[in-house]
Amino acid sequence: MGFFGRYVRQTAEMNAQRGTLNIMLETEVQSLDPQVATDGTSFEVIADYTDGLMQMDADGAAVPAIAETYDISEDGKTYTFHLRDAKWSNGDAVTAADFVFGWQRAVDPANASEYSYMLSDIGQVVNAAEIIAGEKPVTDLGVTAVDDKTLEVQLNVPVSYFLSLMYFPTFYPVNEAFFNTCKDTFGTSPDTVLSNGAFKLTDYQPAATAFTLEKNPDYYDAAKVALDGLAYQVIKDSQQALMSYQTGALDMTLLNGEQVDQVKDDPEFTSVGAGYLWYISPNIDGVPELANENLRKAITFALDRDAITGDVLKDGSAPCYTAVPPQFATGPDGSDFSADQTKFAEFCAYDADKAKEYYEQAKTELGKDSFTFNMVVDADDAPQKVAQVVKEQLETTLAGFTLNLTVEPKKQRVQDMQDGNFEIGL
């Protein structure tokens, strides 16, 4: 039940003499803990000062980062990463044990990491699913520090896009000794954050609306980092952000659909795939009716993704029919794993007749003629617009279906969904 997001932005031409890049954020950072963070804003900032095993190159391919080289077993189920000489910003060496600790934190039920499934369902790391379910200890996770510079990962089955997952923040390393000195304050200030990436955090506090990062002189690839630093500003009003760009206060700003029409012919306008999904998440564990497959199929076929992307977002976003969005992972041949969306459209593209057919089956199976659900949605402009159209589409196509909307700050919405305190989430 998703569609693919796209970043559209105005970008001033930068060069090595500019010093600091001034960037807009749409929302505050929710968490700087890589295993706890769930939102794109947090991931963007964490990735500015942290490197994982791999990174994405300009063509979207996975290339070495902290891992200098790697080997893949003949059966595709064992990955051995050989780490380069890299340092944390406190002078400690980045070791294989840092990755083991970070990954164990991700699957530890005590941490309730929303993206723990990246290791289990998506990454297929041995014993990840059992650990998340509380059936095995975190020490049974299929990741081993053979020595300080060698990390071995065991998978249940071959995963063709596994290397692409390595630049997702949930897979980032955490220095265990440093973490233990911070505990509950980890990731809340420059003093409780370590960098092993191109930049390091200089001033930040939770819910900050402006903060900076400076170039990390100890970064292994520092010679290739042209900027002296990054300056982030949280600007929630898109028109204010565009004005700040036009006056030179910002070097880069995101645009909404209406603004795209205004500036699309400007040579500084850029449109790039964001590699993320908008999706509707039904709480099938907490709401019995939503566990009914035919009801979920009815909802799926009642959604007109083309109308949402073309008439509401209007920013180049495209309908998506796969759980893995385009530009997110590569397949066995090195090409985009989800580039061809057309072959999946028949399973979930808009079809009012199919939606009504599945809806009637669901009503019979559940013994009900009508349904009322509540959907939580972020308090930002775009999510509210999308939610309103989703409500209209479902209520128009499915007679007797009511979708109420509850608007919450993103942090609260994320927490409610993590706690299972929701019916449907956007």
Predicted regions and their residues:
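Alpha-helical secondary-structure segments
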Residues: 96-102, 148-154, 198, 227-229, ...
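Ligand/substrate-recognition segments at binding pockets and active sites
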Residues: 206-208, 360-426
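Surface-exposed binding/hinge segments that line
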Residues: 98-100, 114-177
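N-terminal lobe/hinge region of extracytoplasmic solute-binding protein
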Residues: 24-74, 194
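Structural transition elements
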Residues: 319-361, 380-384
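Gly/Pro-rich hinge or "lid" segments in bacterial periplasmic/extracellular proteins
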Residues: 149, 155-225, 229, 239
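Ligand-site clamp/hinge motif
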Residues: 217-263
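Aromatic- and charge-enriched surface segment that lines or borders ligand/interaction sites
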Residues: 68-118, 152, 289-291
